[in-house]
């Protein structure tokens, strides 16, 4: 019997497939699926519980209710398999056919499919070139549409209301034909001749001038071509036959008490059948038109509700007032088929329990409660018991296990040996959220977890729960052990740093051990070796912190693995000598001869991993942990109230601040400062007071003065518990200590603005009621934020995963010759990220030369590891061009060389590594640590914005970047270009600092001259924008008429008069057309030219410009001619944290973005309109000029006659990524996004490797716009996949034809996910209805290339260990295809050919 079932099972299995195609079903196809027509709305007979005949659950159509038994009971048992009972008509077979057999309903009148009607853009509307409203009016019987105009003046597709229809009937009789309802639409669709229409539209496309019309025609053409190539017929968008879902997929379950629980679909089907039957009856009776029409409309509405309830009109509700769940609702959303059942499934062999600490475990172990283990490993135990002969049958074994006999535990021990289990903690934000451990059986009911893996899980022991999963098959166990074992996941995939670093108690213990104390017991002793130190400590002769001399022996391991020993005497402490006992051979003693804070320990582990490899590191990490716990216990460090020492200066500092605030208040009342200034100043005062208090407090806490052996006072770090905890990095921070022992400081309101009365008390003194109330404000906001943040962060991660999920490493080297230029990140006077951190683990794209020679230092395709980075630093290399995934040339995936090092393993990345998902997780996982708020600039920040000079921090020489300058009369340089930057270079040629300097800056030093640290080298006026003269001569006023276009003003304080140009709005009508300007002339009155051009030196003056020279005054080079007052730019809120990251990845346009120059050329202004000015850029080569209207309130950085380069900033503002891509290219946009995202994460102290962000950017740049079509199939202005276009172009070039040209396009991650090649992946992400509608109309085929699609269809994913399976399958398929191709020539459409070719190329790529 068993074998027979097995055989039957094998029969029904489908063979392997390579793609999934979706299309429209024709009425015949629907009938061919069906096993019979459902004619009655009845479901089950409520007395007998048997399905009604020809009803929705009919056994004759859908199959038997019980296995191998017909409905009337005439045939039972297996022997009658396949017989159709002559009495009840039911086939005798398994009951599971009721899950797969479909029925159908023949509709009495055709019905439009709501998806193709209402899902925007309406496909039926596009096809017929009618508006959605018109079609709806036809479908819902409000007006007629002409189908056959005959010999009349009517046109086909014309709408007629009831009255006009009757008039036309009177006029023309039956010359013409007009109908209403879906029949009419069906006729219109049927009459379309696709091939003719396509031909005609392709011909008229080039001659269309209007942009909107062209877009519309292109859209329609695309739709028609999709129909044409896919073999779908337009009339199939109208249903004549409705398929009925198999009954077991919409079950009806009898509850006790004679009621039934039912799926909503049954209700919806019943309505359709009722209305359909009523309509049939009315048609048979030849009822009046109006009644039939009404019934047809109701039928249309009920089918709409069945397919997608609530898309049109109000949703149909059930008895309990909630809308019924239609077919569309079954598949979309979090609870729909895709996300609930296909992407996430429940698993068996799992258990969950609370976790507790397992401080005695090794890193690869976890403690598993016996009870859980027994339950989880039951099948293994049964098998073992039977094999041992302890139980005769499975049943007996089961009894033994239930009784928990003694032998069972022995067997369990054996089964568990070396059988890893997987532990998972929700939320699993990155791949370290599931790791494998070897179980150790323990008493009790809580899982024990090794403390060092807590950081990876983000777990703590305040009641967290974890799930245990058992890998069953041998392969699964192998993968768990080789890939997921906690000992194999030491480095974080996000940044390549160790993720197994001690924290909290362990750090405190190690820090305490390694501290030194003056006058410790045993100070000054000398020891022969480390073991002697141990004896001294154990016997109590020397204490842990005593300074001693020790002779140590170090092992040095050379690159070739040769070991040499060296001995030296070293000044150290007893504790550090003890630490060196656990130090693995080959590491230097200096690594522990320091105060071991968290950073130092992390560095120690990192060094260990890089020098000695995995095994030593794992053992060492465990030893560190045991030692740390031991000494943390011995130290007895705890928090007591006396540890919070309040500095004496606090009270005077607070009093001073209060006095200052009073003074400001008085100034405000006498009207000297504005309310805003007062507020900002008050906040500044308190912020600085707070700083001073906390500084005083930290100085007080951190050191104490001790008299040493020689009787000299010496400073030593304090052993205050709170200070030690913060200093070591175990817990707490200076900011928190400040609140305990300093003052709490300023608090924020929930809207982010700062309350100007600070809390001057600290927690030790205690808060009064008012202070407490202010505190609660912020605290409550924090809690609310956290809840929102989690949801937002999760959604960001989901979008990232979705956009990047199909990126896998598929070849070694794509051979591309360029990449991204990497420089150290310098902001102002600080190197934020040195070059080595940016290029570590990347591959060089172009040879790196030794500076000043043409000798190659690092050849192309070198993987830069730590040693190489040191070499680069020694030669003070300042920039390296490295390979990047953004420029990788592989078609469907990336190559290993462009990606570089696998961060979690430390070697070049393997084939099949799913870098897309890793990148998404690495960026999404820290999302919960980012803030949600936008920062309001208040107080300290608003002052810094108006800086007016550059003061350097390091000595070096001065370099200017893209700067034009002139020398003024004092020999100083004046900058006359926009985005200029000034850099300080040290003697090795490395850049140390970089500053932006605005137009009109006066430099105190010449280029390449030496500057000293702290020198001020550049000055400018932040409040006005000067116009600098580039030639010497005399000033000539043009159109400057006193009282018309300008006024004279005299400064009260200095008595100097100056000329102010009137704004256009303030002039009289006479002055409206005049354009005031300054012309520069020589002594003879001839125009001077701007150097290097034929342009006369004439400077047009905008409104409000202040001219300080008089007419005919002499002027020198570099002097300011006029000044334009700058309104201090409105303090913009900086969007910070998570929203900023989301905005960047969604490539959203900022409000009021910077305006960039579209082409290079000379600026001039055309005719102004009411609110805008016209900016014209004329290129030097005389080609087409470009003009743009700019609102007047925008502050322009340019004036007439100035030259700009393409992509330069014309008006300040946040830059839009799209503009950067268009005007400055891919490299710049990549740099921009990477740096901006990194800024947000850096602020929170989160390290993420640039690679991950680049991976996402690559996916955002997946699509391109076709600019010219060449000989390809693409349409101009069409959006296409870049890899597709590249493949098509390669073919064409091989055939000697013209390829298409394209512009890369930047899509936000949501848009990019929805635009993927795979409709299955897109549908399971968002907007399921729209995606599926579009795919069905185009008859799309999903090549199942990404990870998500393969999970959904239930295959191994084409990454990791599943990569090999897919590779071999594809190779076999290619063989079959090539052998088949020799025998028969099949007709293939262009798109299919292209797809096959793409697949083959893809294979070729993955083979080599």
UniProtKB/Swiss-Prot annotation:
DNA-dependent RNA polymerase catalyzes the transcription of DNA into RNA using the four ribonucleoside triphosphates as substrates. One of its GO terms (molecular function) is DNA binding. The lineage of its organism: Bacteria, Pseudomonadati, Pseudomonadota, Gammaproteobacteria, Alteromonadales. One of its GO terms (biological process) is DNA-templated transcription. Pfam families: RNA_pol_Rpb1_1 (PF04997), RNA_pol_Rpb1_2 (PF00623), RNA_pol_Rpb1_3 (PF04983), RNA_pol_Rpb1_4 (PF05000), RNA_pol_Rpb1_5 (PF04998). The RNAP catalytic core consists of 2 alpha, 1 beta, 1 beta' and 1 omega subunit. When a sigma factor is associated with the core the holoenzyme is formed, which can initiate transcription. It catalyses: RNA(n) + a ribonucleoside 5'-triphosphate = RNA(n+1) + diphosphate. Belongs to the RNA polymerase beta' chain family. The keyword Lipid metabolism does not apply. Binds 1 Mg(2+) ion per subunit. Binds 2 Zn(2+) ions per subunit. This is DNA-directed RNA polymerase subunit beta'. GO terms for cellular component: DNA-directed RNA polymerase complex. The keyword Ribosomal protein does not apply. PANTHER family: DNA-DIRECTED RNA POLYMERASE, DNA-DIRECTED RNA POLYMERASE SUBUNIT BETA. Gene3D superfamilies: 1.10.132.30, 1.10.150.390, 1.10.1790.20, 1.10.40.90, 2.40.40.20, 2.40.50.100, RNA polymerase II, clamp domain, RNA polymerase Rpb1, domain 3. Zn(2+) 1 binds at residues 70, 72, 85, 88. HAMAP family: RNApol_bact_RpoC. It is an enzyme of class 2 (transferase). Its cofactor is Mg(2+); Zn(2+). Mg(2+) binds at residues 460, 462, 464. Zn(2+) 2 binds at residues 814, 888, 895, 898. Its EC number is 2.7.7.6. Keywords: DNA-directed RNA polymerase, Magnesium, Metal-binding, Nucleotidyltransferase, Transcription, Transferase, Zinc.
